[in-house]
Every structure is written in structure tokens, then in C-alpha cells.
Amino acid sequence: LKLTLAVVCVMFSTSLFAQKIGRISSQEVVVNMAEYKEAQTQLEALAKDLQAQMETIQVEMNTKIQEYQKGAETMTDAVRQLKEKELNDLNTRLQEFNQVAQQELQKKEQELMEPIIKKANEAITEVSKAGGYTVIFETGQMIYFDEAQVKDITPEVKAKLGAN
């Protein structure tokens, strides 16, 4: 009985050490995908468009500030209050536009990145299964690993996705 228990323990511990462990830099995979580069191009175009719209509002505001400053001394109180309200409203509009623009960019980024990340995760899973890996760790999350014992599958996943 003791011999059987010892043999079972040795076999169990051997099977634990036989696990195939890999690592991946998913960020490296994603940023090298053609889809990611296209998404970045779309995001940059959207950001440029939103920036141009914001600059238009800013120019309008600067013009009205200059007009206000030039005529402030000769304005009646009623006109001055009206102009100040107009400037405050324009400033509020600019701040609101900035906030909406940031939200729009974040939403678009999430919309574009979701299928890219899904595709990368599917490729990681396929390469992991094909390679017989039992565990894959994210490289950036590992504090220590023995490079001889943990294979980096990043190049294989990039090759599967056609990412340079």
C-alpha cells in the first residue's frame, strides 16, 4: 500500500511538471495587426475632424472676446451683460463639445478595437491548443519566469495573423 501510494505521488508530481507553459505579449500582437493600423488611421481622422470643429468654436470665441474688449468701455450695462452671457454660453458650448468629442473618440476606439482583440484572442487560443500548452501567461504580468521553461508564442501568433 505504501509503495502504491509512493508511485501514485511520483506519477502525479511528474504530470504536474509535464505541463507546457507559454507566454504572450498580446499588446505586441495587436499593434502589429493590419486591422489595428487601419483602426488607428480611422481614429486619427476622427480626432482631426473633431479638433477642427473645436478650433472653429475657439476662433469664434476669441473673435467675440476681442470685440467685447474693444467695445466694453462704451457699452451700456444691458449690452455688456448680454455680451458676457453670450461669451459664457460660448465657453460652455466649447467645454461641452470637448467632453462629447472625447466620449465619441472613446466609443469609436472601443467599437474598432473589440473585433481586433477578439481576433487576437482567438489566434492565441488556436496557437496555444495546437502547441499543446496548458497555460499561457501575459508577458507583462509575469514577475519572474525561466525562459528555458516558458516559451514565448508571440511570434507564432503574429505569424498566424499576418502581423509584422
Language-model regions, residue ranges each:
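Sec/Tat signal peptide C-region and signal peptidase I cleavage site
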Residues: 12-18
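Amphipathic, charged alpha-helical segments and their helix-to-coil junctions
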Residues: 19-164
